[in-house]
UniProtKB/Swiss-Prot annotation:
This is GID complex subunit 9. It catalyses: S-ubiquitinyl-[E2 ubiquitin-conjugating enzyme]-L-cysteine + [acceptor protein]-L-lysine = [E2 ubiquitin-conjugating enzyme]-L-cysteine + N(6)-ubiquitinyl-[acceptor protein]-L-lysine. Present with 784 molecules/cell in log phase SD medium. Its EC number is 2.3.2.27. It comes from Saccharomyces cerevisiae (strain ATCC 204508 / S288c) (Baker's yeast). SMART domains: CTLH. Identified in the GID/CTLH complex. In the absence of stress, the complex exists as an inactive anticipatory complex (GID(Ant)), composed of VID30/GID1, the E3 ubiquitin-ligase RMD5/GID2, VID28/GID5, GID8, and the RING-like subunit FYV10/GID9, awaiting a substrate receptor to form the active E3 ligase complex. When cells are shifted to glucose-containing medium, the substrate receptor VID24/GID4 is induced and becomes part of the complex, named GID(SR4). InterPro entries: CTLH/CRA (IPR024964), CTLH_C (IPR006595), Fyv10_fam (IPR045098), ZF_RING_GID (IPR044063). GO terms for cellular component: cytoplasm; GID complex; nucleus. A zinc finger (RING-Gid-type) spans 434-501. It is found in: Cytoplasm; Nucleus. The gene is FYV10.
């Protein structure tokens, strides 16, 4: 039986379904660490068995020299056992921490269930004020968890020079609120750190290290992350003219993907030849002029070809003629034709810095799916659920603002007055205090569906205007005073304005409504 609601809040099952990651992440962490611990135990046990067998062979020689060897072997075995013991103690502490997180989270949601159970027992006599206060406090804590999750994911990791430690505002917020056991911030920080290294530092080492640690899991998922990371490493080596390491990277890390990514490998091979040949053609006295792929991609195709050719050869792109001006070998002819045709479009995507964003999205997708983490921030999910219930067909009309901005310079005085009146009714009446239309939530609300409202609200003093629209009489009179006070429109005494179509009517022309 579902718990009775106090103010239309969702039940416990709803929160559990939306927060499965709070229990799935610790489960994955425990699984990974148990597998790692078992592998270490098997390895060290095998090593101890080998040492024991060697020690037994030494004991067969009953002399002083072999006794010293036996003593050294026993000392080494004791050192290994101590090392295993320290390792196991460390692992046990980490297991206890993870289990304690799960326990705290179960208690957190059990608290919500208990509050709802108390409400069902006190609602008959109306004495539920204490329960209501507890529920509000629970939701305040839960909101802080959502905020901490969002900050941990999206805020950068900063370095404190005084304490010589790294910190994140989301983790600091969670610890200050004593909610750090209710979220796996260490996992989110790892994703944040690798993502920052890709987007802002252009550093592949953290990503490659993470790929090596989770290679088995990525292989089972048939992930292309490793190939794309190694391909980006290869491209970056070519950009700095490090052809030797680029070839080693190609042979060692890219060739194993020849069956699954043959087309991409052909393009990567062509990129090596293309850049090497172009650099050989550069004048020795010239310096690099920069290669802005973002600017080139925004230009037309002929301009792209000219800019790329200009970058590599420091001269204009030659035009195709009916006959070659000079006699060349067969290889030179084919090269000349390719260069004259400007067929560089296929290499632009490889050289584009946008690949870093694509690689980051691919990493986050694999990382979050590995731990069962939602790729969308839980805070934004809750905001979307709430805002979607407020979205109507009158929300989000960008054409109103755009038209006003475009016609400001050429508008006459009369048109300017009409425009000011339109902006006033738009922002002060139609969109006043509307979260859907606010600049803060507009990026979230644009893709949301409209709400399905099946109930209407009646005005306190409804009147029917001649155009068929119904409004509150007091609010129309208040609007008329505001418009005259701000000199937005000229209204005679006893006149009112419809805020939708901005037509002016006399109060005597309106009809008082009596809803039944």
């Amino acid at each position: 039986m579902a718990e009775k609601s106090i103010f239309n809040e969702p039940d416990v099952d709803f929160h559990l379904k939306l927060n499965q990651q709070l229990f799935h992440i610790p489960y994955e962490l425990l699984s990974k660490r148990i597998k790692h611990t078992q592998a270490v135990i098997n390895k060290e046990t095998k090593s101890l068995h080998e040492h024991t067998a060697a020690l037994n062979q030494i004991f067969e020689h009953n002399d002083v020299e072999h006794d010293e060897l036996a003593l050294a072997k026993i000392t080494e075995m004791i050192r290994k056992v101590d090392h295993i013991e320290r390792f196991l103690n460390t692992q046990i502490k980490s297991y206890c921490q993870i289990l304690n997180r799960i326990k705290k989270r179960l208690e957190f949601f059990h608290e919500l269930k208990d509050i709802k159970s108390q409400n069902s027992g006190t609602s008959h006599n109306g004495n539920n004020e204490g329960t209501r206060t507890k529920l509000i406090q629970w939701y305040q804590s839960y909101t802080n968890i959502l905020i901490g999750d969002y900050l941990t994911r999206n805020n950068p990791i900063k370095y404190n020079s005084e304490t010589k430690d790294h910190w994140n505002s989301g983790v600091v917020f969670l610890k200050q609120s004593q909610l750090d056991d209710l979220i796996d911030y260490d996992v989110l920080l790892e994703a944040n750190r690798i993502s920052t290294s890709l987007l802002h530092e252009r550093n592949l080492l953290p990503l490659i290290s993470w790929i090596n640690e989770n290679k088995k899991t990525l292989t089972k998922k048939s992930s292309i992350l490793e190939f794309q990371a190694r391909l980006q490493e290869y491209i970056e080596l070519l950009k700095v003219d490090n052809y030797t390491d680029a070839i080693v990277c190609f042979q060692r890390f890219l060739l194993p993907f020849v069956k699954s990514n043959f087309t991409d490998l052909k393009l990567a091979s062509g990129l090596l030849i293309f850049i090497k040949y172009c650099n050989d053609q550069k004048p020795t006295s010239s310096t690099s002029s920069g290669f802005d792929t973002e600017e080139i991609k925004s230009q037309s195709l002929p301009m792209k070809k000219d800019r790329i050719f200009q970058h590599f050869f420091h001269k204009s792109l030659p035009r195709i003629t009916s006959k070659p001006a000079v006699n060349t070998t067969d290889y030179d002819k084919s090269s000349l034709i390719n260069l004259q045709s400007g067929d560089f479009e296929r290499y632009l995507n490889l050289l584009d810095d946008q690949r870093w964003s694509v690689l980051n999205d691919l990493f986050l997708s694999d990382f979050y799916s590995m731990y069962g983490i939602s790729q969308n921030d839980p805070l934004l999910i809750y905001l979307s659920l709430g805002i979607s219930s407020l979205k109507t067909r009158d929300c989000l009309h960008p054409s109103d603002d755009e038209n006003g901005n475009q016609e400001t310079e050429t508008a006459t005085t009369a048109e300017k007055e009409v425009e000011d009146l339109q902006l006033f009714t738009l922002h002060s009446l139609k969109r006043k205090n509307c979260p859907v239309c606010s600049e803060t939530f507009k990026p979230i609300t644009q893709a949301l569906p409209f709400a399905h409202h099946i109930q209407s609200q009646l005005f306190e003093n409804p009147i029917l205007l001649p155009n068929g629209n119904v409004y509150d009489s007091k609010k129309l009179k208040k609007l008329a005073k505001t418009l005259k006070k701000q000199n937005l429109i000229s209204l005679n005494p006893g006149q009112i304005m419809d805020p939708v179509d901005m037509k002016i009517f006399c109060e005597s022309d309106s009809i008082k409504m009596y809803p039944t």
